[in-house]
């Protein structure tokens, strides 16, 4: 039983209401949504596990809230004593409860953001959103370009219909929530949205409330922990589920909104159905960089699976289209086609495997006759892919299926032209246009799969070939000799190797991947990305291997520059590549380059990485212009600020001028996929943000930095890099401190991804993946990779010359790149709490390292103060009270999980740590007691004391949910 005086203790929702700031507008229901969900959850908790457990959860929450009010470290100790006194089952239940609360808080926030946005659209009021830079919609952007910036409507239309945003979904292991829970969360979100609709009846409200409670209980009763790591095929299926649930219907809905927005600036045309505004690609099953589980067989499987899913989605809609296009009037072109198809079909033909239109369609329904043939081929396309996926072969001939998107679209275009010719354009611009836009966007493969591989793996293959040919060791050759040999082979026609080539397992894997690319239809694939690319030979090597493996339609080859030195050398490498006549002829005036935000940040710290990424883009674009090449930048951004994350619109608008120019590729990783596409409104908003920001950047580029700003940035970057590397790579105590002070070593137990946390099993920070590196610091709310280096750079230049402070403030107020960079770090400080890191040190770190931790926390505080000084703010987030409120609502439950995590890690790492466990407090009924016991038994193979490992994992997941990112 909880020991505090519960009569004096405020309920959780009462405490929530106290957090409501005075300035919140009438349409802001976030506190109300949050309180409703928590009230429902606490009632469920009491029903399932008794009043004592509910009171304990409330007591824990109150202690955390008291700490958040005064930041008294004694409250953390009091909280720790209470938490460590819980038995194994109760400990899991408390951690699970707070993790659940934070997931519910996220859902309340998503519903509120959608509601707030809709209300602002109705009122046309964006005054409190700094011109809505984070929420801008397409109509607002078009009006701004035409009415404020005096662009002609036709100029805007031409730019829009020719631009492309390619969103690349990746399986980066940052989505810590199981798909089973994501689906339940979606239903909770829908219930909450409907509950606050204005036209709801009392009966509707009662039924929705029951449904809400049912889904909250179902989510709480679901095991949050993945008991086995997902396979790449699992990741692919999870990623593809977003297409089925939101993206598939979201794209035509969004394009209709674009049509409406164009009409409102005087353009009476619709966006052409084949305009490439939005494209989708994927790395799921294609990204083999450091992931041995992504094999050639996996790549083949995911391509066939995506092809089957695409055919199935089209097939599920074609009968609706047949019902809609029932008219008999058509043009001669369609009539001739319909009569041919009708004559060639068997008399009295029946198709019992169809639900509708299973008998032969009469010739006086010409649209249905033509669409019926489309349906037949879609059915065969789906079945052939299914056979190939399950059996490896199919008796359905390829000519009975659709093999390219042009032949699929041909019949649809025929119907569209006929309707327009007969005066039925309004009908043509309905479901048929939506369907054609889907076909143009998703093709026959749903997404295009990128292949990613390390450059060293290609070098190993070519080394084996040159040794087999007895012409030397490719690995030992200079760059010049490599290029000379590669170009001579690319210019010739002789095959380089046959079946007698000696192959290690690694070499066979690389070659078999190329063979899979050659075997499958070319529209399955997008780019071939080379990670750790440093020289032109890295690109030419892939070109040669594609030819040797008989790939008829070679993939475009994209070098990925990640580390600071590689980014600095990238422009020169690209210039050398463009100087090669053979290569310039090959690319036909188009090149793509990928830049990595994660590894550059881990290598040099956020400040220097951000500035080098900015400069590299400018220089790469200049090189491309010099050689007459159109360059597309592919941004490898993660969800966290440490890995290049941040609000989409701001991120795009802060890129250097001329670097997007109507063509953008960007990764959508892990938990960001759910945040972007988890629900229809989120999907719609994501498509709007990317399209609007890309258009605005191209037509109204941000300012270029002044020469004196550049000089100051260069100076600060040197200081920031030195500060960052002196601690992370050169400080001999750092690796030991990092592994003791954070849950980095325990990260792999979450089973959130298919790939290992390290590129190589041994080694220090260099071999650690960027995601677990950021994840570990996010969990302790210290965020070291984000801010380390900023403070030292600011301090040095301000001490050198006080005028530099004025210049920094000028840069913040006038230069979007600098402002966005600092604002994102400020947001991270709003989420941070060095006292949590200090508690971790006292519990988990050896005493001789305590002064080192104190030193880092002093740097944290110094950086925070300098950041506020440069931004001209008195306190963190003073310019964004809405975001400040949203973060404050999370602090108490996150703090609870921080404390549970710290003490659980102590018990895991130090078996001699004594705790006095009180009797179980969850309800004493046989059923409830059994429930708590079963929670402990869900992990029977744990090497630790009962309940500890699951409690730890639940805290990791809950903190990730509360911080709204993992790695």
UniProtKB/Swiss-Prot annotation:
Q: Does the keyword Transit peptide apply?
A: no
Q: What is its EC number?
A: 4.1.1.31
Segments passing through the bilayer: none
What residues bear Phosphoserine in this entry?
Answer: 11
Report the activity regulation comment.
By light-reversible phosphorylation.
Catalytic activity field: oxaloacetate + phosphate = phosphoenolpyruvate + hydrogencarbonate
List localization entries. Answer: Cytoplasm
Q: What is any one GO biological process for this UniProt entry?
A: photosynthesis
**One Pfam family of this protein, by short name?**
PEPcase
GO cellular component annotations, sorted alphabetically? cytosol
Alphabetized GO MF terms: phosphoenolpyruvate carboxylase activity
| Catalytic residue positions | 172, 602
Q: Which UniProt keywords apply?
A: Allosteric enzyme, Carbon dioxide fixation, Cytoplasm, Lyase, Magnesium, Phosphoprotein, Photosynthesis
Q: Which InterPro entries match?
A: PEP_COase, PEP_COase_bac/pln-type, PEP_COase_Lys_AS, PEPCASE_His_AS, Pyrv/PenolPyrv_kinase-like_dom
Its main subcellular localisation, reduced to a broad class, is cytoplasm
Its biological purpose: Through the carboxylation of phosphoenolpyruvate (PEP) it forms oxaloacetate, a four-carbon dicarboxylic acid source for the tricarboxylic acid cycle.
Q: Which PANTHER family match?
A: PHOSPHOENOLPYRUVATE CARBOXYLASE
Annotated HAMAP family: PEPcase_type1
Q: How does it assemble?
A: Homotetramer.
Per the similarity annotation, which family is this? Answer: Belongs to the PEPCase type 1 family.
Q: What is this protein called?
A: Phosphoenolpyruvate carboxylase
């Amino acid at each position: 039983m909880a020991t505090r005086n519960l009569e004096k203790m405020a309920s959780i929702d009462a405490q929530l209401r106290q957090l409501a700031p005075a300035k919140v507008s009438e349409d802001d229901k976030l506190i109300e949504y949050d309180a409703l969900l928590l009230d429902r959850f606490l009632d469920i908790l009491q029903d399932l596990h008794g009043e004592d457990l509910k009171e304990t959860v409330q007591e824990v929450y109150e202690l955390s809230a008291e700490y958040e009010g005064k930041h008294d470290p004694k409250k953390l100790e009091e909280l720790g004593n209470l938490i460590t006194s819980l038995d194994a089952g109760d400990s899991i239940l408390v951690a699970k409860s707070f993790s659940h609360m934070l997931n519910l808080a996220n859902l309340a926030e998503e519903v509120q953001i959608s509601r707030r946005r809709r209300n602002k659209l109705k009122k046309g009021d964006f005054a409190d959103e700094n011109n809505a830079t984070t929420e801008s919609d397409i109509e607002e952007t078009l009006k701004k370009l035409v009415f404020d910036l005096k662009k002609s409507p036709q100029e805007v239309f031409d730019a829009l219909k020719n631009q492309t945003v390619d969103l690349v979904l990746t399986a980066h292991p940052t989505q810590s929530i199981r798909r089973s829970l994501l689906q339940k969360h979606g239903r909770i979100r829908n219930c909450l949205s409907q509950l606050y609709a204005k036209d709801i009846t009392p009966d509707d409200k009662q039924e929705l409330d029951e449904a809400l409670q049912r889904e909250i209980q179902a989510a709480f009763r679901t095991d949050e922990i993945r008991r086995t790591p997902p396979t790449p095929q699992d990741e692919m299926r999870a990623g593809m589920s977003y297409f089925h649930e939101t993206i598939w219907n979201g794209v035509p809905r969004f394009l209709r909104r674009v049509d409406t927005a164009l009409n409102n600036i005087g353009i009476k045309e619709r966006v052409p159905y084949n305009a490439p505004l939005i494209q989708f690609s994927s790395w799921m099953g294609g990204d083999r960089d450091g992931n041995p589980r992504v094999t050639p067989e996996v790549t083949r499987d995911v391509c066939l699976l995506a092809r089957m899913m695409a055919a199935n989605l089209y097939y599920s809609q074609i009968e609706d289209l047949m019902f809609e296009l029932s008219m008999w009037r058509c043009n001669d072109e369609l009539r001739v086609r319909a009569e041919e198809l009708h004559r060639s079909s068997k008399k009295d033909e029946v198709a019992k495997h169809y639900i509708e239109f299973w008998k032969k369609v009469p010739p006086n329904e010409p649209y249905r006759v033509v669409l019926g043939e489309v349906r037949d081929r879609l059915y065969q396309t789906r079945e052939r892919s299914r056979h190939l996926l399950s059996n490896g072969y199919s008796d359905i001939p390829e000519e009975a299926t659709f093999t390219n998107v042009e032949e699929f679209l041909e019949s649809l275009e025929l119907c569209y032209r006929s309707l327009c010719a007969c005066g039925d354009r309004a009908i043509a611009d309905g479901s048929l246009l939506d369907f054609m836009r889907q076909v143009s966007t998703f093709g026959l493969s749903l997404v295009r799969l990128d292949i990613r591989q390390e450059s060293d793996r290609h070098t190993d293959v070519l080394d084996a070939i040159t040794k087999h040919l007895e012409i030397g060791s490719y690995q030992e050759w200079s760059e010049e000799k490599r290029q000379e040999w590669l170009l001579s082979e690319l210019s010739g026609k002789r095959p380089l190797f046959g079946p007698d080539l000696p192959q290690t397992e690694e070499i066979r894997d690389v070659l078999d991947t190329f063979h899979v690319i050659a075997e499958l239809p070319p529209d399955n694939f997008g780019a071939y990305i080379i990670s750790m690319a440093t020289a032109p030979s890295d690109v030419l090597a892939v070109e040669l291997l594609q030819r040797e493996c008989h790939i008829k339609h070679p993939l475009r080859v994209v070098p990925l520059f990640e580390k600071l030195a590689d980014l600095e050398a990238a422009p020169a490498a690209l210039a050398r590549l463009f100087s090669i006549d053979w290569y310039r002829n090959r690319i036909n005036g188009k090149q793509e380059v990928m830049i990595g935000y994660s590894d550059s940040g881990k290598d040099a710290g956020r400040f220097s990485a951000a500035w080098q990424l900015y400069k590299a883009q400018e220089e790469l674009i200049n090189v491309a212009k010099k050689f007459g090449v159109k360059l597309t930048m592919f941004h490898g951004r993660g969800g966290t600020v440490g890995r290049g994350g941040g609000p989409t619109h701001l991120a795009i608008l802060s890129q250097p001028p001329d670097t997007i120019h109507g063509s953008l590729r960007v990764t959508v990783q892990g938990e960001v996929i759910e945040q972007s596409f988890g629900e229809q409104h989120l999907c719609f908003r994501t498509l709007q943000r990317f399209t609007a920001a890309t258009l605005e950047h191209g037509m109204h580029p941000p300012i270029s930095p002044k020469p004196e700003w550049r000089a100051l940035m260069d100076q600060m970057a040197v200081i920031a890099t030195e500060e960052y590397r002196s601690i992370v790579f050169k400080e001999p105590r750092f690796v030991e401190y990092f592994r003791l002070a954070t849950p980095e070593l325990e990260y792999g137990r979450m089973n959130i991804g298919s790939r290992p946390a390290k590129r190589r099993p041994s080694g220090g920070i260099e071999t650690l993946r960027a995601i677990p590196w950021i994840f570990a610091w996010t969990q302790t709310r210290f965020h070291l990779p984000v801010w380390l280096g900023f403070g030292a750079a600011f301090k040095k230049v301000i001490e050198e010359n006080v005028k530099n402070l004025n210049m920094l403030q000028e840069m913040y107020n006038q230069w979007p790149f600098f402002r966005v960079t600092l604002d994102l770090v400020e947001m991270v400080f709003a989420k941070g709490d060095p006292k949590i890191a200090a508690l971790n040190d006292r519990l988990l770190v050896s005493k001789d390292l305590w002064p080192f931790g104190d030193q880092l926390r002093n740097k944290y505080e110094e950086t925070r103060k300098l950041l506020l000084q440069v931004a001209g703010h008195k306190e963190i987030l003073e310019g964004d009270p809405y975001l400040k409120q949203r973060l404050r609502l999370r602090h108490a439950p996150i703090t609870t999980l921080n404390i549970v995590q710290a003490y659980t890690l102590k018990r895991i790492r130090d078996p001699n740590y004594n705790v006095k466990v009180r009797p179980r407090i969850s309800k004493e009924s046989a059923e409830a007691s059994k429930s708590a016991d079963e929670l402990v038994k869900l992990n029977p193979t744990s090497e630790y004391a009962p309940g500890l490992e699951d409690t730890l994992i639940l805290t990791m997941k809950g903190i990730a949910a509360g911080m709204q990112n993992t790695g």
